[in-house]
């Protein structure tokens, strides 16, 4: 990447936000559902996951029309997970990034449905990438479903909930982080490799790199 990170983020984060809004605005859905979805999209955040998709492509000197759609797909999954994590049955948080959480504004039921809608929209986005080959679309859908499902983010959240009542060892903590946070971060980098149509060897190298990025993300 020839640009500094700060410049790259300033150039691309607004484009990500614009694409996210467009994807939701064009939906023919109940107004309160749309408001709930937009509310969480507007809640802030660094857009780390979609930026990783774009940064991987930038580092490989690849430009694709559908890159922002793929980048937004992973951000939709991330945002849906935050809505559900904040619910009373999970982490029971009233605030996120200084704003009332979705369920405190729209109620538990609509918050759940807004999260569900975002999850579905993420996969819908991956089917609308006209510049990609069907094999690329299928691989992206497979990887995102794995990263966000029982083997990834959802499974990590279950492990996290199970570990709340006891002390965890290093291996258990790593298992949680690899799934709950690392899986989507890894997908973001692997998605860039798929979009760039890298060979299996290069994809493997980026996958190993992505794994370490996911772990490093937990260091404070």
What is each stretch, according to the model?
Residues 1-24:
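N-terminal amphipathic/basic leader segments beginning at the initiator methionine
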